[in-house]
């Protein structure tokens, strides 16, 4: 076989040995050797291949697959702007610590700077956003060196996997694996008995890298009035389960003492234990910035968040002494009930349907075993305000840099991964539900994610709920939504679009319905085959009034 074909087959084989089970492929000419190798692996059942037209959405599909499966996922593309389109997904994967492998084909390096078509300096393009940038040299037509080249290629692939999974750093993230390929780019007619240079026996990786243990115990006295702030990427800490906890929807719930974020200003904690990285709620930011309140940061990796510079100590787990005062626990529980009641009462009293109403309806309709994917703007905040009980529910959201990009594709990837895991361990006839709650701008921004070819894997039970207030509702709640700017804010921040969601879905052959908010629960309970979109019309002009009423009720 020709050198490029040999190299591509070796790389794909080693990626599979290292735990890659899903690969997203974008079409191109220069990456043809990789495409042929991936198709062969898909046909033999070693991977599940997903072909997409748009590299930007492909990157987010890979993120959804990776966070849903907890495993590294590759996205493969040709050279040039195809690589640049992975920028947003790479940035998200960096800050969310997602093991995303960008597998890019490149032109031979001697063509750089010559004006050759579709050629750019793509190695190093992602700069500080990747854990590593690794390149393979051009494959040589040198049969006498096949064994040495095989070892070099497999070793480099294992370095890519170790960097992406954080095996030696406890800091998973994106890696750029750039492979220059020389023509011929398609397989030659192969003689009988032609084989790919072999890897280690029994399907083992060429270089095994055991996961690093990262353990930094931190002594914390719980007799001091304490609240826990559990953010994105938080670990599970059973010895903190008794403490009042403000948990973001994506954080694992490890206790039975939840604390509503709006209850925080009503309390005076004496210390804070911060788990993971908080990304929501201004009351949380205010508390973490209070110089009078010590903050202890517990993370699952080497980095820790500290926006205000107020963290007193960091570690990975708490070694606790003392016990929380019963009076403190009782007061926190009372304030939690008070905040939840205030939200529910004002929702019931408000005359118009808002995104918060939609989030409350979705939260109420969820059941254990569901997976929930949330848009990064208002939906993830609204679900938290609605008091979602996340016990038994997997909650996903792109909180790395909290952009609305690629959310439809992320939801599709998460659904495919969740269903795949269920098929391997449960009943393949009853796929678990994935429900995505996103805003209309988020939906429109990634509507091309709905484009799934007829030969590609498709979710068996994914419902995308679009809370459609015809624009950016979050700006109604920010400084830009102040009535002083009412004459211009609707256009330059609200960005109304008047998109016909149903027509857009029909263009992609996706089932869609427009329903009222009180129909959400019953409709979600109706089994849907495949992927569907439920659109709920909402009002954003009264959001500021609703949130002011909730605050006043507190």
Swiss-Prot record:
GO terms for molecular function: 2-succinyl-5-enolpyruvyl-6-hydroxy-3-cyclohexene-1-carboxylic-acid synthase activity; magnesium ion binding; manganese ion binding; thiamine pyrophosphate binding. Binds 1 thiamine pyrophosphate per subunit. InterPro entries: MenaQ_synth_MenD, THDP-binding, Thiamin_PyroP_enz_TPP-bd_dom. Its EC number is 2.2.1.9. The keyword Transferase applies. This is 2-succinyl-5-enolpyruvyl-6-hydroxy-3-cyclohexene-1-carboxylate synthase. Its cofactor is Mg(2+); Mn(2+); thiamine diphosphate. Belongs to the TPP enzyme family. MenD subfamily. The gene is menD. Keywords: Magnesium, Manganese, Menaquinone biosynthesis, Metal-binding, Thiamine pyrophosphate, Transferase. Catalyzes the thiamine diphosphate-dependent decarboxylation of 2-oxoglutarate and the subsequent addition of the resulting succinic semialdehyde-thiamine pyrophosphate anion to isochorismate to yield 2-succinyl-5-enolpyruvyl-6-hydroxy-3-cyclohexene-1-carboxylate (SEPHCHC). It catalyses: isochorismate + 2-oxoglutarate + H(+) = 5-enolpyruvoyl-6-hydroxy-2-succinyl-cyclohex-3-ene-1-carboxylate + CO2. It comes from Mycobacterium tuberculosis (strain CDC 1551 / Oshkosh). One of its GO terms (biological process) is menaquinone biosynthetic process. The lineage of its organism: Bacteria, Bacillati, Actinomycetota, Actinomycetes, Mycobacteriales. Homodimer. Pathway: Quinol/quinone metabolism; 1,4-dihydroxy-2-naphthoate biosynthesis; 1,4-dihydroxy-2-naphthoate from chorismate: step 2/7; Quinol/quinone metabolism; menaquinone biosynthesis. Pfam families: TPP_enzyme_N.
């Amino acid at each position: 076989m020709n050198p490029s074909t040999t190299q591509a087959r070796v790389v794909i084989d080693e990626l599979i040995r290292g735990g890659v089970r899903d690969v997203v492929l974008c079409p191109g000419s220069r990456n043809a050797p990789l495409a042929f190798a991936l198709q062969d692996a898909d046909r033999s059942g070693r991977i599940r291949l997903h072909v997409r037209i748009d590299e930007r959405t492909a990157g987010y599909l890979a993120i959804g697959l990776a966070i849903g499966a907890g495993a590294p996922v590759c996205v493969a593309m040709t050279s040039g702007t195809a690589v640049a389109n992975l920028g947003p997904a790479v940035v998200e994967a960096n800050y969310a610590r997602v093991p995303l492998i960008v597998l890019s084909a490149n032109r031979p390096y001697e063509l750089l700077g010559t004006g050759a078509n579709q050629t750019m300096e793509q190695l190093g393009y992602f700069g500080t956003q990747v854990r590593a940038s690794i390149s393979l040299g051009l494959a040589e037509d040198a049969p006498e060196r096949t064994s040495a080249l095989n070892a070099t290629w497999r070793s480099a692939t294992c370095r890519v996997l170790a960097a992406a999974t954080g095996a030696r750093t406890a800091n998973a993230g994106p890696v750029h694996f750039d492979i220059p390929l020389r023509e011929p780019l398609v397989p030659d007619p192969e003689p009988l008995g032609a084989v790919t240079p072999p890897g280690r026996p029994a399907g083992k990786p060429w270089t095994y890298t055991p996961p690093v243990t990262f353990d930094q115990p931190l002594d914390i006295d719980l007799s001091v009035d304490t609240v826990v702030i559990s953010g994105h990427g938080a670990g599970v800490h059973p010895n903190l389960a008794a403490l009042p906890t403000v948990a973001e929807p994506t954080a694992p719930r490890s206790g039975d003492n939840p604390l509503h974020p709006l209850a925080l200003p009503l309390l005076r904690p004496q210390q804070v234990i911060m788990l993971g990285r908080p990304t929501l709620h201004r009351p949380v930011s205010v508390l973490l910035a209070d110089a009078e309140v010590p903050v202890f940061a517990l993370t699952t990796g080497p980095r820790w968040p500290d926006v205000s510079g107020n963290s007193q100590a960091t570690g990975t787990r708490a070694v606790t002494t003392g016990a929380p005062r019963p009076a403190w626990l009782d007061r926190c529980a009372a304030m939690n009930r008070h905040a939840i009641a205030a939200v529910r009462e004002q929702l019931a009293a408000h005359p118009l349907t808002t995104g918060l109403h939609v989030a409350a309806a979705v939260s109420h309709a969820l059941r254990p075993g569901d997976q929930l994917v949330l848009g990064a703007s208002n939906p993830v905040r609204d679900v938290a305000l609605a008091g979602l009980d996340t016990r038994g529910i997997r909650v996903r959201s792109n909180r790395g840099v909290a952009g609305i990009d690629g959310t439809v594709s992320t939801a599709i990837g998460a659904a495919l991964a969740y269903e795949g895991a269920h098929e391997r361990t449960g009943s393949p006839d009853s796929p678990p539900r994935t429900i995505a709650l996103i805003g209309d701008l988020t939906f429109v921004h990634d509507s091309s994610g709905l484009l799934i070819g007829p030969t590609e894997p498709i979710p068996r039970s994914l419902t995308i709920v679009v809370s459609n207030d015809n624009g950016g509702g979050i700006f109604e709640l920010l400084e830009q939504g102040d009535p002083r700017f009412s004459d211009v804010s609707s256009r330059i921040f609200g960005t109304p679009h008047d998109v016909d969601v149903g027509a857009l879905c029909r263009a992609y052959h996706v089932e869609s319905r427009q329903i009222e908010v009180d129909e959400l629960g019953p409709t979600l309970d109706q089994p849907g085959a495949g992927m569907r979109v439920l659109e709920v019309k909402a009002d954003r002009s009264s959001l500021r009034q609703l949130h002011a009423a909730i605050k006043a009720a507190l």
